[in-house]
Amino acid sequence: MQLKISKANISEKILMTAFECLSTRGYANVSMRNIADNAGVALSQLTYYYKNKEKLFTEVINVMMDQYLREIEDNIKSAKDAKEVIASLVRFFKELIMDNPKLLRLFIDFTAQALWIPSFREQLDGLFNDLTEIIERNLLIDTKISNRSLGYSPKSIAKLILGALFGTSIQIILGTDKESAFESLNLAESLLN
């Protein structure tokens, strides 16, 4: 039994090291050897658990996806209407930018890689669908949303909200104007309400 625990710890250590390397240097700038060296394991151990960089990144993505879904759900579950849902989402993205930019950078890198790697594209599509569904489900608590939707489905509205906040967050994290960085997220909140 101790052997299984030890193997799980090695696998988890590799995964956490990969998350750290990928979120600080990006997919294109990290090799399996970099991850093995930083994790303090032999390259053969890393390939035993994860076979190749794509499979390892896929596992890192799974961890990231679980974290995003859980945090967004936790942020908006207490909202009483669509306005509070949107305010909670804006607050989530602000906190993500300020407190956990590595997670956002990893999400951005994942999005870029998904353009070229089919397995990442499938995962990202699944993540966006899950996030859209969470937002949509929470928007439906507000019956006023259907009166303001101008004939668009709640799913389309949820996709617009997610796209606006994710895209604006990318601009903020890449931007140099830190003084007024969050004005655009505040504006998105005002426009979406």
Question: Which residues fall in each region the model found?
Answer:
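Residues in soluble alpha-helical coiled-coils and helical-bundle/repeat scaffolds
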Residues: I5, K51-K55, D66, K77-D81, ...
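Hydrophobic alpha-helical connector segments
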Residues: E59, E73-L103, P154-I161
